[in-house]
Amino acid sequence: MQGYTKDQPGQKNLYRDVIDDLQQISENVGNKTFYHKFGSKVEPIKENEIAKATKPGFYICNESQAKCNNQETRLELPFKAAKANKDATYVIVTDLFLSSKQLVGSTLGSLTKPLKSILKDEKSIGIVGVMSSFNGNIYDIPKKDGGTFKYTEAKKRPFYIIIIGDQKNIN
């Protein structure tokens, strides 16, 4: 996600504007707004720190790779939280980039099961894609012959806003 925070010459950066707008909008929906970041785990963010999500430093971890929360995207974690707290409205901003192992077998089920349950509970799920400038690395791109590589030439890339909750809060 860090690549969305850095300007790309000649490209419009929408990420910062959208994050600012989402913060204002979310404070008008429901009684209380909670912010979290997620990678391999979900961590709370204080309301006065949310603006840091628009800066590259927010995504940097100075710990060992094993201790860093930015080494994978566990998108099923906020989905499980949304399933557990049925009265809340969840707004998730993600690049929707999943590793190939997350898209097969039981791991795929851990992603789809909470979504199916949310829909069965008559909640709505809205997804909006936003094409924005991108200036960073895209990791774990699968190779045809196996393995992965890092792509560094992207100038634009979409990010996604996933909204889960009552339909009246999503429209």
Place the predicted regions along the sequence by residue.
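VWA/integrin I-like adhesion module and closely mimicked acidic/polar interface patches used
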Residues: 97-162
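Sec-exported extracytoplasmic/periplasmic mature domains
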Residues: 23-30, 83-84, 98, 120
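Well-ordered, non-membrane alpha-helical segments in soluble/globular domains
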Residues: 8-22, 57, 61-79, 103-117
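Extracytoplasmic/secreted cell-surface and envelope-processing proteins
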Residues: 2-8, 43-48, 99-108, 135-140, ...
